[in-house]
């Protein structure tokens, strides 16, 4: 899994605006959010099967 920045897209939170990121697994975006949210997703899904990870993309 790889966390990549989505160019020209941001997310607005109550404390400010941050860049939007995505988690890419086997050429599929499985999660989008802020960089810390994406890193947390990668951490929690570490060790999961490919089917479980790709199920999150639906």
Where do the language-model regions lie?
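Short N-terminal "domain-start" leader segments
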Residues: 1-22, 46, 50-56
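Local beta-strand/beta-hairpin segments that build beta-sheet-rich folds
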Residues: 4, 29-30
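A short, charged, amphipathic alpha-helix used as a generic interaction element across diverse proteins
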Residues: 24-25, 31-57
